């Protein structure tokens, strides 16, 4: 059985030979393993990024590859030509900010002047991009999408791995775009003060993301992850989730599934109070399900509540188990997760959220051995 077949069976609630294993990796963790690669090259260059993902899959013997960035510019060296290399970092200078790159984390944007966010009333929806041309990665960090070269990275990966491994794409929730547009505090206040305008903005981004996801489905991928890290209890109530997240992510999921691909939601932190709401979206699967103390999900309870409605991808604690744990404690925790997760199928072993930058690679290498020994059906 190929790795791809294994993942497809798990996502479809059929029984593979064993539990598949496939983790999302933080950019920092990737770069920690790719010692000789410039973090700037890894971020901006499609071929460097693709080759890095392929190498890391081989290093950890994962059954699939998640492609979290797409739309690289072929002429990125000309666009980002103001570049400084220092002993411990690289800096790319842009018009309004500089991006500081290290091999330990995401690029860090440092604005020359204090960043000022528009108020909800100042937003003219007609001026927002009709076509999604950026990914709001984190805290003012955008990854620009070349609209003439949106999906080259998928072709580069598929040319080298073929149908052997499951390739997954990624898009970002409309809720993230709203938060990025207005700033976190301003956006959360706007949900209360001007909910209808927020919904208009959310629908605008939903239209663009649905189109982007639908186009992505034409590539050689099996699933698309919808990154929605701010939709947990740490940010919004279940009531606001139902009003400002669920209707919009549901549309994107519908667009993906209409193309014959799987869709799964990635929401960090505490989601125990909204598991049933999340599956109302029609999602094929849920990723993360962070255990305490990072979140509040008990895997056995989640399996009972979710039943055969969605597959689960999770839920190893990347910090307390993989980063701070000993190899012995990692083994104990992961065996327990495999035992619970594999019950009735529909399970992919993964970290709850991404592999933290400083997690020892030896701990990640244990995962393949553990599913081989304890994850057999």
Regions found by a protein language model. Give the residues of each.
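Catalytic domains of carbohydrate-active enzymes, especially glycoside hydrolases
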Residues: 50-68, 215-221
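Short, charge-rich binding segments
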Residues: 56-59, 81-85, 157-160
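Short, glycine/charge-rich beta-strand/loop segments that flank catalytic centers
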Residues: 67-81, 173-175
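Loop-to-helix transition at the N-terminal end of transmembrane alpha-helices
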Residues: 46-48
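Active-site loop segments of alpha/beta catalytic cores
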Residues: 1-42, 52, 117-377
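Ligand-binding clamshell of periplasmic/extracellular solute-binding protein-like
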Residues: 22-30, 64-74
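A contiguous, low-structure linker/loop signature
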Residues: 74-138, 163-164
């Amino acid at each position: 059985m190929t790795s791809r077949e294994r993942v497809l069976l798990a996502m479809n609630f059929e029984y593979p030979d064993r539990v598949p294993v496939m983790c999302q990796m933080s950019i920092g963790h990737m770069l920690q393993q790719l010692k000789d690669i410039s973090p700037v090259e890894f971020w901006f260059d499609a071929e460097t990024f693709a080759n890095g993902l392929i190498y890391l899959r081989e290093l950890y013997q994962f059954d699939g590859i998640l492609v979290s960035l797409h739309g690289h510019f072929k002429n990125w060296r000309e666009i980002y030509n103001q570049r400084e290399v220092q002993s411990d970092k690289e800096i790319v200078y842009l018009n309004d900010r500089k991006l500081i790159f290290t091999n330990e984390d995401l690029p860090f944007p440092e604005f020359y002047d204090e960043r000022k966010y528009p108020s909800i009333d100042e937003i003219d929806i007609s001026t927002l991009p009709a076509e999604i041309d950026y990914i709001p990665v984190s805290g003012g960090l955008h990854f620009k999408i070349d609209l003439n070269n949106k999906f080259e990275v998928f072709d580069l990966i598929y040319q080298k791995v073929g149908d052997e491994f499951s390739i997954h794409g990624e898009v970002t929730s409309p809720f993230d775009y709203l938060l990025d547009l207005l700033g976190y505090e301003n956006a959360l206040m706007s949900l209360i003060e001007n909910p209808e305008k927020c919904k208009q903005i959310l629908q605008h981004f939903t239209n663009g993301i649905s189109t982007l996801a639908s186009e992505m489905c034409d590539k050689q991928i099996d699933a698309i992850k919808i990154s929605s890290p701010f939709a947990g209890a740490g940010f919004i109530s279940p009531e606001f989730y139902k009003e400002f997240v669920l209707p919009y992510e549901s549309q994107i999921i519908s667009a993906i599934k209409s193309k014959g691909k799987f869709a799964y939601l990635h929401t960090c932190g505490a989601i125990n109070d909204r598991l049933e709401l999340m599956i109302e979206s029609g999602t094929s699967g849920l990723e993360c399900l962070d255990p305490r103390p990072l979140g509040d999900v008990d895997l056995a309870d989640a399996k009972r509540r979710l039943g055969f409605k969605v597959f689960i991808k999770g839920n190893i604690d990347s910090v307390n188990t993989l980063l701070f744990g000993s190899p012995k404690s990692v083994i104990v925790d992961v065996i327990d997760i495999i035992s619970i997760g594999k019950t009735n199928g529909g399970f992919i072993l993964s970290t709850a959220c991404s592999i933290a930058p400083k997690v020892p690679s030896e701990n990640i290498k244990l995962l393949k051995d553990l599913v081989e020994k304890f994850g057999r059906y």
